[in-house]
Amino acid sequence: DDPMRTRWRKCMMKNAVTNWRTCVADLDSGADAVGSHWMVPPETPIGQHIFAGNFFWAKASFLRTLPSIMDRERIKMSGIDSLDSRYESEVWLGNGPRIPKVKDYHGPNWNPSKIGTCVP
């Protein structure tokens, strides 16, 4: 396994699984979604806000505001199980009527090639 992917995976596991109580507390404190590796433009295409790796917690009340993932153009054209549609679940969270209030445990301006440290 690639060392960067191993660090990335361990960071996501620590922040979304091992520290699940922190996730729940932060959602209870007002965040719409919590996780690691929240990316926004210019690191992503204009209008795309994603948890890279798709490992996050979100409030059901926020998820209910999102359009159905089945309404995404690529999924309509290629199907939900198509390789072409593989990133649609990542972009779905950030493509609703408003951007979620996010707690990113990895911190702002993270660099995917330098994720040797992980918080909290």
For every predicted segment, state its role:
Residues 1-120:
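ER/Golgi luminal nucleotide-sugar-dependent glycosyltransferases, focusing on the catalytic module
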